[in-house]
Amino acid sequence: MFARQSLRFAQPLKQGFRKYSTEAPSKGKSSLAPIYVAVGLTGLGVGLYRYNSASAEAPPAERPKVFTGGDQGWVDLKLAQIENLSPNTKRLRFEFPDKEAVSGLHVASALLTKFKPHGAEKPVIRPYTPVSDEEQPGYLDLVVKVYPNGPMSEHLHSMNVDQRLEFKGPIPKYPWEANKHKHICLIAGGTGITPMYQLARKIFKDPEDQTKVTLVFGNVREEDILLKKELQELENTYPRRFRAFYVLDHPPKEWTGGKGYITKELLKTVLPEPKEENIKIFVCGPPGMYKSISGPKVSPKDQGELTGILAELGYSKDQVFKF
């Protein structure tokens, strides 16, 4: 059984135990360390879920791709739109030179961004994960949260429309195929929601993919919850297959969700048991969260040993992927 914590925060976590409910009609086939959200994730951004179907002129597979990887080099894109989402978060839309082109990204993958500060000897390079649809022609969206002393996030927040930024990619993370796993669990902290949402959106867009998804999302404050509207839409549309649980370090008085940290007790309650077949747990967040939940990665190509809460609960290294 899986606990349900309402995205509308109307139901306390302790009262929320039940099985997946009947799914609503689809709208289209289309330890215990605190989660220090402000630390360590200066290189991540998140794109808004604003899928627009590709026009009839050419299917996505036949459209030109902006990012082709390999020895392509850096691609210069113009900032076309800025939307203030909160005092510390902006949505930035970067246009492609060819309005019919798609990004060329796949799930799950990211892009590198680069700029050179005035007077600096070396450029600043950071990875960002767009979550705008991979088949969206003409542009990509990032949602960027600014962090103190985070040179790339500070630069992006200082940009004006018509200024340009260099991108390179795609950088592969975890290749996804429909029904690759029966049930996946996404444990995210702060802007670590980025690749998680990219993956969830891909799953629920594909009518052939019947994967179940459980999200555990930790933040400092309620206003820090990125993509809350988009996550709520997924849960309302696919209640049999998508569940989201929220935990806040500093919740408001009226908060009815999880409080404090992502704990062993919470994960034991909401995650499938380690003995279940074909499950996968994904982790993405700041260093304190990795240390508590799964242990850190050694490098982009070395997942490192599985430690922390997930190891204590009996999950194996093969059942966990660290973004």
From Swiss-Prot:
The scientific name of the source species is Neosartorya fischeri (strain ATCC 1020 / DSM 3700 / CBS 544.65 / FGSC A1164 / JCM 1740 / NRRL 181 / WB 181) (Aspergillus fischerianus)
What are the GO BP annotations of this UniProt entry? ergosterol biosynthetic process
State the Gene Ontology terms under molecular function: cytochrome-b5 reductase activity, acting on NAD(P)H
Question: What are the EC numbers?
Answer: 1.6.2.2
Which CDD domains does the entry link to?
A: cyt_b5_reduct_like
Chain residues that bind FAD: 180-215
Domain of life per record: Eukaryota
* Name of the protein described by the UniProt record: NADH-cytochrome b5 reductase 2
InterPro entries noted in UniProt: CBR-like, Cbr1-like_FAD-bd_dom, FAD-bd_FR_type, Flavoprot_Pyr_Nucl_cyt_Rdtase, FNR_nucleotide-bd, OxRdtase_FAD/NAD-bd, Riboflavin_synthase-like_b-brl
Cofactor needs: FAD
One Pfam family name is NAD_binding_1
